[in-house]
Amino acid sequence: MSDDQFERGLAMRKQVMGEDFVARAYAGVTDFTAPIQTHITRNAWGDVWQRPGLDLQTRSLVTVAMLTALGKQHELEGHVRGALNNGATVQEIQEVLLHATVYCGVPAAVEAFRSAAEVVGAGEAG
């Protein structure tokens, strides 16, 4: 049986995050972690990321802001890369992180800037 929502999600996930990122995510899948990868691909990427209310660039920038607030650095790096893939500029990412400073606090924003700098190529420690 074909799962069209999963297939659409997988295509969207690859479009946003890149083929290599998705391949690495699935390379580490075990019987235990398979359900969460399927859930993410099917529901986040196959449903929410497919909705018409926001373009992909805006969705990516919103995701960067939320991951900054949550302090999820590993996920943040992937989604900064995704935002760039979706047409966001380095300046837009920088502004999202600076804006997050006001609402999330300086420590969270400093960590987010460090993670984002690794992706955008300005990786000197600050």
Give short role names for the model-derived ranges.
Residues 16-19, 73, 87, 103:
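Residues at alpha-helix boundaries and the short loops/turns that link adjacent helices
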Residues 36, 73-79, 100-115:
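Short amphipathic alpha-helical segments at helix boundaries and their inter-helical linkers
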Residues 19, 47, 66, 72, ...:
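Gly/Ser/Thr-rich helix-start
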Residues 40-44, 61-68, 96-101, 112:
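Short alpha-helical scaffolding segments that buttress acidic/His motifs in well-ordered protein cores
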Residues 31-32, 68-69, 86, 99-106:
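A short structural micro-motif
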Residues 1-57, 85, 110-126:
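Acidic, glycine/proline-rich low-complexity segments that act as flexible tails and inter-domain linkers
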Residues 61-64, 68-94:
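Mid-chain, well-packed structural core segment of small domains
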